[in-house]
Amino acid sequence: DLKNIIYNLKDLSKHSQISLFVDNMKGNKVNYDAIDYAIYVGANLIEIHTGYFSKHIEEGNLSVINEIESLINKANKSNLMVNAGHDLNLINLPHLVKIGGINEVSIGHAIVIDALNYGFEATIKSYINTIKG
């Protein structure tokens, strides 16, 4: 089972960090079960799948900010580091950064698209400035 696999991986290297990729929503409710499960199996951190968050931010549904914030807060209070990624871009990333409590974000194809439109250097600077707040 996953708990034993994680235990064995950590036993191989005391510096191993085990992350689980989790959905922030389960149906129409915040997925707190993902945090409980991550703790149960011995993960050190979670990476929140931000596709749902990103879609709703771009549609103007800002209530999703409170939902993901409560998940991040619970994870942080449970001593889990939090990473986030999926469909993040310069439109929705500021909302996520403002919440705080996130160790790292993964930004994929949005950087490539923005770099094609605005140039690589300008795009990287924009993302760095956004992340720094």
What is each stretch, according to the model?
Residues 9-12, 38, 75, 96, ...:
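Generic structural signal for hydrophobic
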Residues 60-61, 114-133:
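C-terminal helical cap(s) of enzyme catalytic domains, especially alpha/beta-barrels
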Residues 14-74:
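Histidine/lysine/aspartate-rich catalytic loop segments that bind and position anionic ligands
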Residues 2-5, 31, 64, 68, ...:
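Aromatic/hydrophobic pocket-lining residues that form the small-molecule binding cavity
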Residues 45-56, 101-120:
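Glycine-rich phosphate-binding active-site loops on the catalytic face of alpha/beta enzymes
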Residues 18-22, 46-48, 82-86, 103-107:
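Hydrophobic faces of well-ordered beta-strands that scaffold small-molecule active sites
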Residues 1-19:
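Extended substrate/RNA-proximal surfaces in nucleic-acid metabolism proteins
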Residues 26-41, 84, 88-102:
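Catalytic cores of alpha/beta
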